[in-house]
Swiss-Prot record:
Protein name as annotated: Glutarate 2-hydroxylase
Cofactor section: Fe(2+)
Organism: Escherichia coli O6:H1 (strain CFT073 / ATCC 700928 / UPEC)
HAMAP family registered for this protein in UniProt: glutarate_hydroxylase
Binding site for Fe cation: H160, D162, H292
């Protein structure tokens, strides 16, 4: 906890009954809520969207909103306002979402449809240059020769924000577990900015607002560098971040030393949450004030994990960076 903001009362009302889903605080933190669609809701949703294969959602972007409306209607139109309220609430801003009956890699297309529906109730997912679609699926195996830490299993993927090397605002990040075989470890790691004990120190540093260069490796299919500061503020003047240690390119000694100290202070924070995400579940977080990463895996020759991500902008509120749009 730092002096800039304090945890508000948990928005989860123990007396609130929702139609089509349940909502409870997670075991890891009251900031992270667990939302579970009932078996009936899941079954009805999949039946009503069965006519559209994933390719249809790729080709016709308005269908992504159509499937979102179907899901919200099945939840008596309580889902969309709940999602927005939670993700825009500084005291929370994170959900672990599950649909009863979706828990096997054979249902990968159904997983994409469900995640797409949820994401497009809060905004729109951006084009992902790595995959050429509005979402990306990628596999982590025991041996990796890629050019970033995204697929490397035997080391921690450090905490970061998404969207640091693109010009589009990235308000939310969705990360879904599609498959997992011979896996031990590899929990998702999360850190809320207001639980980072060193936030005040780094946010008030002169380099916090200096635009820095961010450049992505070839696998990201992004050739243009972008410039922005590591820190900014939201409409209420509260700190937000746009940071990843792999892609920020310090121009001089001063920036390099400061960024190294920043990285160490984040990775050693006592506020980091370790969250298991079973197959079929996904995390949905506010990317402006949550950092995310991944713990290391135990080596195994047949280790395999497949993930799906979406990241995009909120369409119903303007909680963007104030000085570097």
């Amino acid at each position: 906890m730092n002096a800039l903001t304090a945890v508000q009362n948990n928005a989860v009302d123990s007396g609130q009954d929702y139609s089509g889903f349940t909502l409870i605080p997670s075991a890891q933190s009251p900031r992270l809520l667990e939302l579970t669609f009932t078996e009936q809701t899941t079954k009805q949703f999949l039946e009503q969207v069965a006519e559209w294969p994933v390719q249809a959602l790729e080709y016709k972007s308005f269908l992504r909103f159509r499937v979102g409306k179907i899901l919200d209607d099945l939840c008596a139109n309580q889902l969309q306002p709940l999602l927005l309220k939670t993700l825009l609430n500084r005291a929370e801003g994170a959900l672990l979402i599950n649909a009863v009956g979706i828990d096997d890699v054979a249902q990968a297309d159904e997983m994409v449809k469900l995640a797409t529906a949820v994401a497009h109730l809060i905004g729109r997912s951006n084009f992902d240059a790595m995959s050429g679609q509005y979402y990306a699926r990628f596999v982590v195996k025991n041996v990796d020769n890629s050019d970033s830490y995204l697929r490397q299993p035997h080391r921690v993927m450090e905490l970061h924000n998404d969207g640091t090397y693109v010009e589009e605002i990235t308000d939310y990040v969705l990360m879904m577990k599609i498959d997992e075989q011979n896996m031990q470890g590899g929990n998702s790691l999360l850190l809320h900015l207001d639980d980072w004990e060193h936030l005040d120190h780094f946010f008030r540093h002169p380099l916090a607002r200096r635009p820095m260069r961010f450049a992505a490796p070839p696998s990201k299919n992004v050739s243009k560098d972008v410039f922005h500061p590591v820190f900014d503020v939201d409409q209420q003047g509260r700190p937000v971040m746009r940071y990843i240690d792999q892609f920020v390119q310090p121009k001089d000694f001063e920036e390099g030393v400061w960024l190294s100290e920043l990285s160490d202070a984040i990775e050693t924070s006592k506020g980091i949450l370790s969250v298991p995400v079973p197959v079929g579940k996904f995390l949905l977080i506010n990317n402006l004030f949550w950092l995310h990463g991944r713990d290391r895996f135990t080596p195994h020759p047949d280790l395999r994990r497949e993930l799906m991500r979406q990241r995009g902008y909120f369409a119903y509120a303007t909680h963007h960076y104030q000085t570097h749009q």
